[in-house]
């Protein structure tokens, strides 16, 4: 008899803006990437390789019909087990391997100046503000 690997739980949150946040629980094999987890949770569009814009990997261009544009864009965040808060991964979603129970959130940002994106986290609504974890070190 073959033994199967343990499954992991992934909570996928999608914040469309205007207080519209959706949550989907997934059970998956360890090693699934963040893009595949999103694809299981929503109807998505993405470009498989954005190396022309110096993003070496896939970029999400639409989730459930909410498309990127000049002032609209999707950013994803991760909240790993035993971590203090949400963080911005420094890689494209197809490169981020999820190996343990994790929360992944996608937020549809509408901004002309970027300040909102830098200050508020993935689940911010008019009634609840979530902040993102920051690193103050200079690189």
Please provide the spans of the model-predicted regions.
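Ubiquitin-like/PB1-type beta-grasp interaction modules and other compact soluble beta-rich domains
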Residues: 1-139
